[in-house]
């Protein structure tokens, strides 16, 4: 069976931690492909200011262009309305029903995961993978959440440690506003694109 993963995010901007997570997932889950999906209009970030979708899409495209096992999809940014994860996963599952799908997202989603639209269907469609920038030290809240989901949905959440790179898009945006160096946080072409387009000032 072919294994593929969807790595969703706002990618505002994409940075080396995103790339590192994708490479880690390739090896750990024996993936043929990781599909980066820039978020369109996620319901949990509806009131947050975001860089226009076509600009975020272009940054992701530049970041992954040399890796043949990485691809990008504009499914969410071209879809109307709110970008629900269920709709995205359903779209890819219907396109490739025989593929074993993984969905990769950050640890912050754990706190509201059970409130996601059609979460039970999401667990049926894919293997759920959560990564943490801080590393997984059997935190009490994570243990409780794992048990709760296992009991309620009979599904095991997979975890990845992404603590090797302490980077966040928020941190990068703030450093740019403060006039600090950020080139070492992202692929060179993304950094040059940000400078050329005067982003995050």
Curated annotation (Swiss-Prot):
Keywords: ATP-binding, NAD, Nucleotide-binding, Nucleotidyltransferase, Pyridine nucleotide biosynthesis, Transferase. Its EC number is 2.7.7.18. Pathway: Cofactor biosynthesis; NAD(+) biosynthesis; deamido-NAD(+) from nicotinate D-ribonucleotide: step 1/1. GO terms for biological process: NAD biosynthetic process. It is an enzyme of class 2 (transferase). GO terms for molecular function: ATP binding; nicotinate-nucleotide adenylyltransferase activity. PANTHER family: NICOTINATE-NUCLEOTIDE ADENYLYLTRANSFERASE-RELATED, PHOSPHOPANTETHEINE ADENYLYLTRANSFERASE. Catalyzes the reversible adenylation of nicotinate mononucleotide (NaMN) to nicotinic acid adenine dinucleotide (NaAD). Belongs to the NadD family. This is Probable nicotinate-nucleotide adenylyltransferase. It comes from Clostridium botulinum (strain Langeland / NCTC 10281 / Type F).
């Amino acid at each position: 069976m072919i294994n593929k993963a969807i790595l969703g995010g706002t990618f505002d901007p994409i940075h080396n931690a995103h790339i590192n997570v994708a490479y880690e997932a390739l090896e750990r889950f024996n993936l043929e492909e990781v599909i980066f999906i820039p978020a369109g209009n996620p319901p949990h970030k509806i009131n947050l200011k975001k860089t226009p979708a076509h600009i975020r899409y272009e940054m992701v495209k530049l970041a992954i262009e040399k890796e043949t096992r990485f691809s990008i999809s504009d499914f969410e940014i071209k879809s109307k309305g709110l970008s629900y994860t269920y709709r995205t996963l359903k779209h890819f599952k219907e396109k490739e029903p025989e593929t074993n799908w993984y969905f990769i997202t950050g640890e912050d989603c754990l706190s509201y995961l059970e409130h996601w639209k059609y979460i039970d269907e999401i667990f049926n469609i894919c293997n759920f993978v959560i990564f943490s920038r801080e590393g997984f030290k059997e935190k009490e809240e994570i243990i409780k959440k794992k048990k709760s989901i296992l009991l309620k949905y009979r599904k095991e959440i997979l975890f990845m440690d992404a603590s090797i790179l302490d980077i966040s898009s928020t941190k990068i945006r703030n450093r740019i506003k403060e006039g600090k160096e950020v080139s070492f946080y992202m692929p060179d072409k993304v950094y040059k694109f940000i400078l050329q387009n005067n982003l995050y000032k």
